[in-house]
């Protein structure tokens, strides 16, 4: 596999078709808007703030997390392979007066040219959409400076996550479009830790992300059965 091949064209196409609705708070990306404050606060807490830091958001899509980190005073670069989502992200940043940079590139190509550049790297809800997640994790490790932080979020692979993320979220509640996720691409925490151990990163903590359908809200917690976030640091 070459560096340029760690892309699933069907995944890119799927998100490009929804690109115009990235910033619709009641559209397909509503869950990302709902969980963004939780993700942002987790990053802020674990990375000791973002002000003045160089940050890379891998798989940034329409820029929901990237823009919020820029508003915290970080110098943010958003990276994605989808042309349409990036155009939406650039337009929204222009409309809101948010200063950040968006680049269409694979993480592997970006890492080859920018090793040790960033204080913080975020890779949220992206690993389950690529053929080779280890390649992405290795590239994130290469891109962050020694002493820097890398954050990964994805979905666990088990019966509960299938029932919650696919049967519940996609088929019954229609929270996200059907076909958004492939359960076979979900990553168990033990598998995630094994991949992290093959890099210069050290796992610093893991937290679960929980959805309550009764009040349509999310919270962080200890249970990592479905969604989870991993905090790592490069020593």
UniProtKB/Swiss-Prot annotation:
Pathway: Cofactor biosynthesis; ubiquinone biosynthesis
Ranges in a coiled coil: none
Single GO term (MF): 2-polyprenyl-6-hydroxyphenol methylase activity
Pfam families: Methyltransf_23
UniProt keywords, alphabetically: Methyltransferase, S-adenosyl-L-methionine, Transferase, Ubiquinone biosynthesis
Binding of S-adenosyl-L-methionine, residues: 39, 59, 80, 124
Reaction(s) catalysed by this chain's protein: a 3-demethylubiquinol + S-adenosyl-L-methionine = a ubiquinol + S-adenosyl-L-homocysteine + H(+); a 3-(all-trans-polyprenyl)benzene-1,2-diol + S-adenosyl-L-methionine = a 2-methoxy-6-(all-trans-polyprenyl)phenol + S-adenosyl-L-homocysteine + H(+)
A GO biological-process term: methylation
Family label: Belongs to the methyltransferase superfamily. UbiG/COQ3 family.
Entry EC number(s): 2.1.1.222, 2.1.1.64
Entry annotated with the keyword Methyltransferase: yes
General function of this protein: O-methyltransferase that catalyzes the 2 O-methylation steps in the ubiquinone biosynthetic pathway.
Record-linked Gene3D superfamilies: Vaccinia Virus protein VP39
Listed SUPFAM superfamilies: S-adenosyl-L-methionine-dependent methyltransferases (SSF53335)
Name of the protein: Ubiquinone biosynthesis O-methyltransferase
